[in-house]
Design a protein with these regions (language model features):
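ASCE RecA-like P-loop NTPase motor cores
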Residues: 1-4, 8-268
Length: 268
């Protein structure tokens, strides 16, 4: 509540304020957490052609914390099969460094011919530049970057054209359980009757949308977004998909996933 009041006070000190982002959704959530429930809200459609984005949810794997070790190899296999359909540059996003490293080790054994670069904790400016240079240079033609969802490489980077042709998002981005989050959930449950949504689901989906938005950066870009988690088939998650995601396809079969991606590749 204190954070909400601080934002509201700062906004009310100005004659007017404009907040904009491609991921301010759902509107009700952001209007309430900024203390501006009665503000005007405008939602514009995506300017990019829907057929330029291949969007697939592989909902046959659980990436919940308790299941990660036992599904790590299966997750790595799905990433490898998806990245093998078309040579190019991809980023795979994970909810934590530990999980990312676990799957990356398995991936390297499954797909040794695909180059791998991994985000490190506390990277310097020069290290970040070297990481991004892998995608903008022609030296590596087939590479998968392993990154943390919600981190420095899941928002605020612009890799257009062939610099990035796919984002593979492992998990739903939900924040880890903590005392702070539970207090937030309790507060929003008492005030909005949406404690779990405001404390966990909406912030998580925001990170997913940010990462997915790295792929299509101009009207000429074509690429794929792969969501990996069985929870993407839940109604509460589907309600949060933006309008330009209505063409999403679901599969639990690795062979079917390859066919979907191959068909998209042939449409070029």
């Amino acid at each position: 509540r204190q954070r909400q009041m601080c934002i509201r006070d700062r906004l009310s000190a100005a004659c007017a304020a404009i907040l904009f982002s491609a991921t301010l959704s759902p509107a009700e959530y952001y209007l309430n957490v900024t203390g501006s429930p009665n503000s005007t809200y405008l939602e514009l459609p995506s300017p990019y052609a829907r057929e330029n984005l291949c969007l697939v949810a592989f909902d046959g794997i659980s990436t919940r914390f308790s299941d990660r070790r036992k599904t790590a190899i299966e997750t790595a296999e799905i990433l490898a099969r998806a990245a093998s359909v078309r040579e190019g540059k991809y980023i795979a996003y994970f909810p934590s460094y530990a999980y990312m490293k676990l799957v990356c080790r398995a991936f390297c054994g499954i797909a040794p011919d695909i180059a791998v670069v991994m985000q490190k904790s506390g990277m310097s400016y020069r290290e970040r530049e070297r990481f991004l240079h892998v995608f903008s240079s022609e030296k590596h033609r087939h590479v998968v970057g392993f990154c943390v969802l919600g981190g420095m490489f899941s928002e605020g980077i612009d890799l257009s054209g062939n610099a990035l042709i796919g984002a593979m998002i492992v998990g739903t981005g939900l924040p880890g359980l903590s005392a702070e989050r539970n207090l937030m959930a309790e507060y929003y449950q008492n005030t909005m009757e949406k404690g779990r949504e405001y404390a966990y689901i909406y912030p998580g989906m925001n990170k997913v949308l940010q990462a997915a938005g790295r792929v299509i950066r101009s009207e000429n870009d074509r690429g794929m977004v792969l969501l990996i988690d069985d929870r993407y088939d839940l109604p509460e998650m589907k309600l949060l998909f933006p309008p330009h995601w209505r063409h999403i396809r679901y599969t639990r079969d690795p062979d079917s996933l390859e066919r979907i991606l191959a068909d998209f590749r042939e449409e070029r």
